[in-house]
Amino acid sequence: MTGCLTIAGLGPGSSDHITPAVEQAIAVATDVVGYIRYVARIAPRDGLVLHPSDNRVEADRARHALDMAAAGRRVLVVSSGDPGVFAMAAAVYEVLETDPTRWQDVDITVLPGITAMLAAAARVGAPLGHDFCVINLSDNLKPWAMIEQRLRLALQADFAMAFYNPRSKSRPEGFRKTMQILKSFGEGNRPVIFARAVSTPDESIMIVPLAEAQPDMADMQTVVLVGSSQTRTLSHKGAVLAYTPRSVKG
């Protein structure tokens, strides 16, 4: 008997951000596979086996999930945010392509989730209200030269930007270089949003002009949003908000 594999996003952190479809997938799963921190968000119950694993073993995790599904289990692979954004959905399909006949009978479903990027944007207004791009600043899976090229092109195109994985203890230089490149374009009044641990008890959100933004304002739990030249800030009921207008004059 062949089981099924569901790849689901748990949202940015709060259980309030988990979609009903994902809640249903959790309820019927026999096995949950994922990074330790994400599997810890799943409540144990009878009939459910949890398979937490360390970071950077995405391919092994995907292979294990596919094999269990092929053996008849109802397997749920979990990611934070959305599983298709720098997460496990791509890892599963990468592994599937290496040996498609091995798992040809497994039904695979991807269930979307609310990303940290969109949750952060919602907290401060609508900074991604016009064209924007998303860049993963980790150079674990791609060269820094590619990241820098994409960053410069995004600035030339005047996109608002969202940065994932901006800074870690092992590679603080990448985000420092990113800030230097951003500031080299000379628009120091662009709003920069540092959104850490969005929707969790440890949430902190800060909006500063680009000229005042510092690399140590971010860590690996932070999503950084940078406005375009059109992004504005305003005060409303004592809070500073940011938004990018829907129209741009030619």
For the regions a protein language model found, what residue spans apply to each?
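Class I S-adenosyl-L-methionine
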Residues: M1-I108, Q214
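A contiguous loop/helix-start segment that scaffolds small-molecule binding in enzyme catalytic cores
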Residues: L5-I7, Q156-G250
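Fold-independent oxyanion-binding glycine-rich loops
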Residues: L10-S14, Y35-R37, S53-R56, S80-D82, ...
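Short, solvent-exposed amphipathic alpha-helical segments in soluble enzyme
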Residues: A21-A25, A43-P44, V92-V95, G125, ...
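A generic local secondary-structure boundary/capping motif
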Residues: L66, A122-V124, E148-R152, I181-K183, ...
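A polyampholytic, Gly/Pro-enriched intrinsically disordered region
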Residues: R73-S79, A126-L137, Q156-F159, A211-M220
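Class I SAM-dependent methyltransferase SAM-binding "motif I" and its flanking Rossmann-like core
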Residues: V85-A157
